[in-house]
From Swiss-Prot:
Belongs to the lipoxygenase family. It comes from Rattus norvegicus. Its main location: cytoplasm. GO terms for biological process: arachidonate metabolic process; lipid oxidation; lipoxygenase pathway. The gene is Alox12e. This is Polyunsaturated fatty acid (12S)/(13S)-lipoxygenase, epidermal-type. Pathway: Lipid metabolism; hydroperoxy eicosatetraenoic acid biosynthesis. Binds 1 Fe cation per subunit.
Length: 662
């Protein structure tokens, strides 16, 4: 009994407020009080209420909300609610960060994280069970293509749960940016139909005026072997390179190449031989664009790591050997310059395909979606792991739905301009899905498996390890707050259902590739959650942020090749130009590269989310410590980069987005 002071906070986005009346209830340990239709929430406002309650509620457990329709039904975005009880009762915090729609009743538990086994009086059991039942009806697994990890159900973004849709600022930025690049393409692209590329320098016609500093450097130095090798370490796709343990079986050296054999074996023995194998592309059916056949290769590149840290190519094989056919041609740095250049261009085009489909789309976007859908279906909002992960799912489901409908759909961007479009891209995604391993999503294991832990010139490796360690410490501290021992992990039924939902359902039974079906210890839980957060943040950033830098100069990363791989070394500049994309294709590549790679004005950096899901002081202190460690790493990278010829910023915490949003 007594007065309760209630503060209701509405979101800041354009349509966050509502003209409808909202009814509130306070649910305590002993009783429930209906406060009536007290509220008409306005955008960006904090509404204060002071109400006499004649009942003894006891400790507050839940705030209930129901929006009543007026003549017009308008949704309401509630950030959070605080309630100050009478007497010595402290202030209770009820996080919401979701839309209140229609006539549904929303239950907001008090923000202290609570595992189901810690609720010994079963005060919250019915709320968490009802929440999960409702969520499983809304967050349903869908299916896009056979053999691919599962997406959220829904044909378009309008089919998605309201809480997973873009806010108005994001939606407006996305729509205006897309309209601008399409307008530029329509205006400038008309001239491309009457223009021909006569020299490599002619690609300057489509080179963006608002280029990045690194893009300009790539344009000026793209022919250099050192920059070619550098990209495997620190470029748009640092996920393919590995140290050679033996000479690849596919590398067939014809008679007369004994010197090359000796050099390769020397580097192999010294531990300085590396390889980039694009066998994933072997046999992929190439696209036909405007009635013209495009072409795909599956190269192998052997590289040597020099004492100065430079990675230099030694030999390029553009196709694997075929039974009954002569050994494929091998290209060497000593070959005629145009032949060697064309071989490197073929590698760069192949890397474009593998990067965009395997490293970026599958391992970044689609994997993050599996984690987010499984979490929404399996962990209630009271669960500490839900509270820990929730900020890292913002906008992921909508951006992925848009990608499936516009980028890799029938008549999407890949079909219109990329050599692996019109079905080849799906084939690649299916092959890559079958190769997904748990270790490959954990940088300490992945970099060890690929032999990159001690490669000092791999700035990606150094920064990925550092970021993983910071996230791991953050997760570890959170886990220690809520799980006192391994037994508590094993006996958390919601946690075990979540783990199985990720591995067995979302990833189509990936336990045979190392993904866990259960979590048996705090250490195992920490590793799994760290993998989830790193995937949604650093993993995506490392393969997303470099697109403008490395693909703005078309010859350095052509989206398609219009001629088959060369069968002789008698190559002219005209042969190269005939193979590279025409100006229309090049401008289309630049158009979607600029759109996807642009700076996000509503970007939230890693760990900088404003949403407070935890009311626990200990958890808030852990987040603050995480932010401090990220700030230290960010400053150290800034200082390091100032002395580098080619700065590496893709895993700088201030550049890493808190979730997959573009």
């Amino acid at each position: 009994m007594g007065k309760y002071k209630i503060l209701v906070v509405t979101g800041d986005s354009l349509l966050a407020g509502s003209t409808n009346l909202v009814q509130l209830w306070l649910v305590g340990e002993h009783a429930e009080a209906d406060l009536g239709k007290q509220l008409r929430p306005l955008r960006g406002r904090k509404t204060e209420l002071e109400i006499d309650v004649p009942l003894h509620l006891g400790r507050l457990l839940v705030v209930k909300l129901r929006k009543h329709k007026g003549l017009l039904d308008s949704d309401w975005f509630c950030k959070w609610i605080t309630v100050q009880g009478p007497g010595i009762q402290g202030e209770a915090f009820f996080p919401c960060y979701s839309w209140v729609q229609g006539k549904e009743t929303i239950y907001l538990p008090e923000g202290t994280a609570l595992k189901v086994n810690d609720d010994t009086k079963n005060l919250f059991r019915k709320y968490r069970e009802q929440e999960l039942e409702d969520r499983r009806n809304v967050y349903r697994w869908g299916s896009w293509k056979e053999g691919l990890i599962l997406p959220i159900a829904g044909s378009t973004e309008r089919d998605l749960p309201r809480n997973q849709r873009f806010m108005e600022d994001k939606d407006l930025d996305f729509s205006l940016s897309l309209a601008k690049v399409l307008k530029d393409f329509a205006i400038k692209g008309t001239l491309d139909f009457v223009s021909r590329v006569q020299h490599l320098e002619d690609y300057q016609k489509v080179f963006p005026h608002s280029k990045t500093a690194l893009a300009g450097r790539v344009r000026d130095s793209w022919k250099e072997d050192a920059l070619f090798g550098y990209q495997f370490l620190n470029g748009a796709n640092p996920m393919l390179l590995r140290r050679s343990k033996r000479l690849p079986a596919r590398l067939v050296l014809p008679p007369g190449m004994e010197d090359l054999q000796t050099q390769l074996e020397k580097e192999l023995k010294a531990g300085s031989l590396f390889e980039a194998d694009f066998s994933l592309l072997d046999g992929v059916k190439p696209n036909v664009i405007i009635f013209k056949q495009q072409h795909v290769a599956a190269p192998l590149v052997m590289l040597k790591l020099q004492s100065d840290g430079r990675l230099l190519p030694m030999v390029i094989q553009l196709q694997p050997p075929r039974h009954g056919c002569p050994p494929p041609l091998l290209f060497l740095p000593s070959d005629p310059p145009m032949a060697w250049l064309l071989a490197k261009i073929w590698v760069r085009s192949s890397d474009f395909q593998v990067h965009q489909l395997q490293s970026h789309l599958l391992r970044g976007h689609l994997m993050a979606e599996v984690i987010s859908v499984a979490t929404m279906r399996s962990l209630p909002s009271l669960h500490p792991i839900y509270k820990l992960l929730a900020p890292h799912f913002r906008y992921t489901m909508e951006i992925n739905t848009l990608a499936r409908n516009n980028l890799v759909s029938e008549w999407g961007i890949f079909d219109l301009v990329v050599s692996t479009g019109s079905g080849g891209h799906v084939d690649i995604l299916q092959r890559a899905t079958a190769c997904l391993t748990y270790r490959s999503f954990c940088p300490p294991d992945d970099l060890a498996d690929r032999g990159l832990l001690d490669v000092k010139s791999s700035l990606y490796a150094r920064d990925a390890l550092r970021l993983w360690e910071i996230i791991s410490r953050y997760v570890g501290r959170m886990v220690e707050l809520f799980y006192k021992n391994d037994r508590e992990v094993k006996e958390d039924p919601e946690l075990q259902v979540w783990c199985r939902e990720v591995t067995e359902i979302g990833l189509l039974g990936a336990q045979d590739r190392g993904f866990p079906l259960s979590l048996e210890s705090r250490a195992q839980l920490c590793r799994f959650v760290t993998m989830c957060i790193f995937t949604c943040t650093g993993q995506h950033a490392s393969t997303h942020l470099g697109q403008l830098d490395w693909y703005s100069w078309i010859p350095n990363g052509p989206c398609t090749m219009r001629k088959p791989p060369p069968t002789s070394k008698n190559v002219t500049e005209g042969d190269i130009l005939d193979a590279l994309p025409c100006l229309q294709q090049a401008r289309m590549q630049i158009t979607f590269t600029k759109f996807l790679g642009r700076h996000q004005p509503v970007m939230v950096a890693l760990g900088q989310h404003k949403e407070e899901y935890f009311s626990d002081p200990g958890a808030r202190a852990v987040l603050k410590q995480f932010q401090e460690e990220l700030a230290v790493m960010d400053k150290e990278i800034e200082v390091r980069n100032a002395s580098l010829d080619l700065p590496y910023e893709y895993l700088r915490p201030s550049m890493v987005e808190n979730s997959v949003t573009i």
